[in-house]
Amino acid sequence: MTPIKRIYVFSVLIILFSSTLGSPAVAQVLTKKVDPLRPIIEIKTQKTLTVEELIEKLKRANYTLLGEFHDNASHHQLRGDLILRLNQSKQTVVVEYLLAGKEVQFSGSTLESLHTAGFNSKAWPWSIYGPLFETLRISQRPIVGSNLDRSISKAIFSGANNPIPSSLKVDYQKSSLSAPAMAALEQDLIEGHCGKLPPAYLKPMMLVQRLTDISMARVLLERSSGILLAGNGHIRKDYGVPQVLKAIAPHQFVVNVAFTEDDGLDSKAIANYRDRYDYVWLTKPIERKDPCADLQFGKPSS
């Protein structure tokens, strides 16, 4: 199972269907979680970074985009702890796991507060995401949603006329993908759905993916700075949120960090990441059931 498959099987299908800040203790915990055999790599220079070096680089950005494999709990733990360390401001945390327009107001338990904001703990299992949100609550940062409204996705898949809402149409036109980026997105969606994606699904799925990235970018730009938590596919520079931000807000300083699974990257593998990510944080691969084994598609709506 390739990394890109885990990006999309656990992301697009979910979208469519379903005060210890900066303390030495926090720093020590985060440092201990970094496996020296699976480092943080700066893609441009191919240098290995310490956590402290990465933090200093992220502090310079207007917008920091942190990726993930959705089912890897260590990615969520590392990102939560990283946000605790980025304590120079109270940047808003923008998340994929809530719809755009939703904001978490903590009252009572963390899970109850998230449910009130529309969080789906079946789509985003609490056993995996719970520690992340508990850490975000400690950080005292605002948490807002950015995902595409499901009614838009349903309209696209039902074949509705003019399904792109007026609020996103201008940015959709401004951020049109180049032919190579469009081809890369198409291929990744096909591979990411195990080669089982019916041809009739491809065009609407690509549109949903693009509008989701635009929705995320718009929510970020409502603030002077922010941190996005989303799947690695959404934070890609060639066809994800950074591409949208570059098209509609070219003067903003955007940095992305992919959290991925690998025992190591050679120079060729690093070169393949050059047009996608600024930094890659490697973690130990986890054991998982093959998501392709039971993946099936019904007939698209006509």
Regions found by a protein language model. Give the residues of each.
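Zymogen propeptides
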Residues: 46-87
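A substrate-binding/cap region within the structured catalytic cores of diverse enzymes
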Residues: 97, 104-223
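Membrane-embedded segments
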Residues: 70-81, 94, 100-109
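Acidic/histidine-rich, surface-exposed loop or edge segments in extracytoplasmic proteins
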Residues: 36-40, 59-67, 110-117
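N- or domain-start disorder-to-order transition segments that initiate the globular core
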Residues: 13-61
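Short internal beta-strands
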Residues: 92-98, 255-260
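C-terminal regions of proteins
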Residues: 215-224, 234-302
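Bacterial N-terminal signal peptides that target proteins for export
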Residues: 2-11
